[in-house]
Amino acid sequence: MVDIVDKALRMGEGRQIKKLENVAKATNALEDEIAALDDEELKGQTAKFKQRIENGESLDKLMPEAFATVREASKRTLGLRHFDVQLMGGAALHWGNIAEMKTGEGKTLVATLPAYLNALDGQGVHVVTVNDYLASYQAELMGRVYRFLGMSTGCIITNQKPPERRKQYNADITYGTNNEFGFDYLRDNMAWEKSDLVQRGHHYAIVDEVDSILIDEARTPLIISGPAEGDVTRWYRQFARLVLKLNRDEDYEVDEKKKVVGILDPGITKVEDYLGIDNLYEPNNTALIGYLNNAIKAKELFLRDRDYVVTGGEVLIVDEHTGRILPGRRYNEGLHQAIEAKEGVEVKAENQTFATITLQNYFRMYDKLAGMTGTAETEAAEFMGTYKLGVLPIPTNKPMIREDKDDLIFRTKKEKLAAIVRDVAKRHKKGQPVLLGTASVESSEVVSSLLDVAKIPHQVLNAKQHDKEAAVVAVAGRKGAVTVATNMAGRGTDIMLGGNVEFLADAKLKSEGYSPDDTPDEYEKRWPGTLAEIKDQVKDEHEEVVKLGGLYVLGTERHESRRIDNQLRGRSGRQGDPGESRFYLSLEDDLMRLFNTQLVARVMAKGMPEGEPIEAKSVSKGVRTAQKAVESRNFEIRKNVLKYDDVMNKQRTVIYAERQAVLKGADIHEDILKFIDDTVLSYIKGANNGSDKPADWDWDGLFKAISSVYPIAVEQEGAKDAVDKLKGDKAVEALKELIVSDAKDQYSDFEDKLGSEGLRQLERRVVLAVLDRKWREHLYEMDYLKDGIGLRGMGQRDPLVEYQREGYQMYNSMIEAIKEETIQLLFHVDIERVAMTEDEETESDEDEAVNAAEAVMGLDGEAAATGESAPAEPETDDEAEKTTIDELADEQKNEKGIVGMQPISHAEGKVPANKRPKSEELHSPWADGRTFPGTGKNAQCPCGSGRKYKMCHGQNEQ
């Protein structure tokens, strides 16, 4: 099936390549003409192109001239001329494809072509890389080309402050990592001031190492979180000690393949005895099960120096695909705290999600998306299905002559490692550079220690030495170099035989005190001479290493993904250089042990001689089968993550659009008046007990509830008399008009005291405060819903459909709550205080007045915006058509599968199991004086009455 899909996707590939070749030919035809321009004339091309775009000329028509201009600027600044295949790659990127270009083909230089072309219309271009170092290095190096042509370059890196970020985003071309771009988007949607925004829209993105970012990292959503309420760190420490007393397969079981654990009956007994409780599964003890499962996972499934490292008293996650540390990332749902307790470091507070988005949905926001990688072909179907990106293989500039040897497979890891050391010693003795690829920090340190014993000098590059990554890789191709590195995916510095000329030239100039940022004129002046000097030094060594066979890549084990194996191999044989690659495997490697156990057992039973490699096609086939099994599993995980996030994505898009409109000064006065109408109507319908007759309505409950929203002046008896002779909808409408008229009269008095502009500003700040808080609560509820939704499958119901349905119900309930609490807050704000604030033209007192009103109502008035935002003001029309909150709510009522849905209990989505009512309580009469702690007041009451909690048992809360 996969082969059929792959063939279908490749239909028409020849025609596409022909189009790319035509672009290269058209660009070449202009080369002499552009080369004849002096520096000032060449720089003047940019202004001419912009004018032609203003006059209506398309970017496609400009492309050959723009590419020829960039090529000439690159020759004059960097001494690098784009090859024809690089021009083809640039055209593929401009047309919104993935350009599959082998390692060493100059992808960084290729990006300058479409980046310059697409920046001409002034909307900004984002070039996405895998780490801060590469973002800085590429922005600095390629920025010389852009600056020569009058284009500005920015770079987004960790720890920049909002004003600096805004400046970088305002540049024509901005480099940065996928995480920084994504988190800035989330922070922009938590900002409280228009001046705090940093991004300016999502026009065009070029993603380097696109498979690493859009495939490998797509399983993990971006999350901004803050401390949750309550201190539960002692439980993590207690369970970390407890699980040390439990034995695997006796007290609990572990499935390493699926990464799940389960407690067995003997283990349950031990846990209950240790904690001094009678029944671990009683409702009051339910939360303890989560601590127990996380403690077992931390003990058995998450290993130090493989999944994480401990540095400076912190547990830092290691990216399984690239071997890099992921600063700031934490496992969720209490797992990170369990690992911290296991390692004996400070257990940090649990977090609550404030904002989240998957990488898939973030990058799908761009008007145009493109990417580059050396290994996209195996994931072509996923790129097309998820991102609508085609994959175009770009020919190499010179033929590939690397020799890829068959795998050598040993029975045990010990035998494999001994053979690896012998092979490396032989290669090192003759001076051939060797790159050893490992799958984890732990493996790299084991290999390093064995090389130390063999007295083979070497460099180690793993998550613990990530700061010297580029320097190590730049010299990994020198004669006699031996480099041990964790996964090479995303290592953006080329391994050049004899040494990386550009890197060494840049390092020499910087050591002499020259930099393209601080001393650009002197740097550019000295660059050609320094580059020529380094080239001469490297040339002889390059030729010597070529004679020795080029770079030898030795993989110490197969990775779960064939792509990452191919990326490791691809470090050798760049630009027509010779090279060699081979993988050493053992039947004890995780990939074989977990995913091909029967084959392993069969081969081991044959009793092969110790130290002899196994040569069997069945074993090599078994490796490929195991890799395909893991790739298939990971693809399903990514698909699942996306399906569930798509439910949230539409909601998030509308909420964020509404929030941005408010933040930028939209007049929402008419919305506020409608909120009053909707809130009053909701209360009346909630109090009618299903009866058409006003005499049967709960008048006491209704007036008590409405008086909590605003100081109602309508007399209860007078209201009853006014609708006594009416029935059904007429009675509801008459009562609504009576109460709404009273509320709007009082609200009009506020406007008289504050003035129109003063009230408009207050309305915006109150809506932001309420919207942020209710959105956080909604994310919290949706997390709880998703955690337990898988169990619906046991009842023959599709968990995803259930999640969609209940998620939309919860969303609509949140919208009601936003309307109601906005009105409630506005009527509780100290108007005199706000009026004084307006006179002084300050906002801090106004915010305090809003917070004080929240405190009166028992709400948390703190803004969610933790962390500093940054992008520039989006260049969008404030009057542009947008979907409103109400429109989405109405639309969702008509969604397929949503019609006729019964209301759900928010308690199931939000309240932890140990706080939920017992089943025998669910049918109790509503006026029995009980309360259900933790239930949202706009949620349906857990008693089963069908009423909102605040109109039911919530009335009994003090």
UniProtKB/Swiss-Prot annotation:
InterPro entries: Helicase_ATP-bd, Helicase_C-like, P-loop_NTPase, SEC_C_motif, SecA, SecA_CS, SecA_DEAD, SecA_motor_DEAD. Its main location: membrane. Zn(2+) binds at C941, C943, C952, H953. PROSITE patterns: SECA (PS01312), SECA_MOTOR_DEAD (PS51196). One of its GO terms (molecular function) is protein-exporting ATPase activity. Keywords: ATP-binding, Cell membrane, Cytoplasm, Membrane, Metal-binding, Nucleotide-binding, Protein transport, Translocase, Translocation, Transport, Zinc. GO terms for biological process: intracellular protein transmembrane transport; protein import; protein targeting; protein transport by the Sec complex. Its cofactor is Zn(2+). SMART domains: SecA_DEAD, SecA_PP_bind. One of its GO terms (cellular component) is cell envelope Sec protein transport complex. May bind 1 zinc ion per subunit. Residues 863-883, 902-937 are annotated as: Disordered. ATP binds at Q86, G104, E105, G106, K107, T108, D494. Its EC number is 7.4.2.8. Belongs to the SecA family. Part of the Sec protein translocase complex. Interacts with the SecYEG preprotein conducting channel. Has a central role in coupling the hydrolysis of ATP to the transfer of proteins into and across the cell membrane, serving as an ATP-driven molecular motor driving the stepwise translocation of polypeptide chains across the membrane. This is Protein translocase subunit SecA. It comes from Bifidobacterium adolescentis (strain ATCC 15703 / DSM 20083 / NCTC 11814 / E194a). The lineage of its organism: Bacteria, Bacillati, Actinomycetota, Actinomycetes, Bifidobacteriales. The gene is secA.
